[in-house]
Amino acid sequence: MGQAALNILPVTAQLLVEGGDKRIKLDPLRGVNRYGCGPTPDPNLLDYSSATASVISTTAFAAANRLRERLEQDMRYLTPDAIYERELARMRRELLALCELGDLPEPDIVFAASGTDLHRIAAQLTQAATDRPALVLMVDETETGSGIRAAITETSPGIQVAAVALRKADGLPRSAAEIDAHFTELALQAHAAGRHVLLIQADISKTGMIAPSYGCTAALQQALDSQLDVLVDACQFRIAPATLRACLARGYSVALTGSKFVGGPSFSSALIIPAGTAGQFRQRPFPRKLANFSAAADWPDCWPVREVLERSWNFGLLLRWDAALSELRAFRSLHDVDVTRFLQTFARAMQARLSGNPAYSVVAVPGLDRSALLEKPGWDQVQTIFPFQLYRATDSGRQVLNAEQTLQVYRDLPTAALHCQLGQPVNYSAERNALRLCLSARLVVQAVANDGKDANRIITQALTVLDQAARLANLT
């Protein structure tokens, strides 16, 4: 965050990697961040990595560059903190419109650099809103952000964190009933011990799962009433507006990022808090520990933050969110029926290739069930993250790649002759990591626009990326 007005802003590529943490700092030798993404467009990259991060598109970079130019002009007569506040207010309005939330009492939107910071903020708000000690109940870290648990406990040592595994030791998913029972047991135990519970509902996890079920979350909300807060971890942003509205209508806060499915640059996050829940939080003293992670303008002006948070600014966050909104705008222009049709066609093609070729095995993902929220399913019922295990050919058949070998394939993909990228490996069972082929909103726009003329190209490219991963597996 800036601390003094500048006469000239850094160039767009530099601003895009400022105002985050070490994860988006560029490797001086390779020119990419920890997620393998540089700060400028790479039109030749076959990018199917959106569960982790995406390289910025030409369109999104142009949007960020236009904003940078406007910021620089405005700094001649406005202070940076005033500009920052104005731009975030604009982005709140556009995000509300793009998420089609106009039929609800207006929720509050809090901006932050990362999804990790959103979880930190939610935990702090929960702790501040109750006189009881708090328990955060979440899915195991193999299926969510690796630093979330540490971030919560470091910021709030008095908060306990409990986690539920979504997969068995062999990598197969636990049944929904088993997962729900585990969440319920831990929540009821905490409640009986006098704790307030923050339940983090994963939608979608690293391998594409929803947990606990929304039915379980609703039952816990009824049982624990005011002693339960719910945060929907939708940081992948693989949810339709109807799903988001349904969550907010039930009083659930929702964490989103612009850098996963939407395809914007890494480190652009937003916490959407329903009006009723926000009103309850605002009645309590604002958590002073958030001064290290928030600026005053990150919060709507109805929050009592001015005595706690600095009037600082983060122009890198502005550019990253503006880039993400340009991608979301294009995606929201599509008809849901066309999106659903393409997603289903794509999913069938990926499942056929992954299950019908000895170079891969499918990492099972249960169906996406949001029936407790909505009677009519939307496009977000269709799988868009495809985790798979790689094998290399041997004289006797095939041999599974271990975690180190899988990581090497992941690292080699962007630098190979065929320039491509997959989602980071996920440890889904003992000694085994899955790569993830992922659809992004940008790819869906390319496939569906122009009457779907490019749909086959997007599918063929994805199959080509899988073929390249198989070739590299045989070289490890």
What role is predicted for each listed range?
Residues 110-113, 119-308, 314:
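Conserved PLP-enzyme active-site core in the AAT-like
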Residues 426-476:
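PLP-dependent enzyme catalytic core of the Aspartate aminotransferase-like
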Residues 3-28, 32, 59-117, 125-132, ...:
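Conserved N-terminal alpha-helix of the aminotransferase class I/II PLP-enzyme fold
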Residues 259-379, 466-469:
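Active-site C-terminal subdomain of aminotransferase-like
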Residues 60-70, 85-91, 176-188, 211-222, ...:
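Well-ordered, non-membrane alpha-helical segments in soluble/globular domains
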Residues 43-89, 159-195:
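Low-complexity, highly charged intrinsically disordered N-terminal segments
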Residues 361-416:
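Conserved PLP-binding catalytic core of the aspartate aminotransferase-like
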Residues 406-439:
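Conserved PLP cofactor-binding pocket of PLP-dependent enzymes
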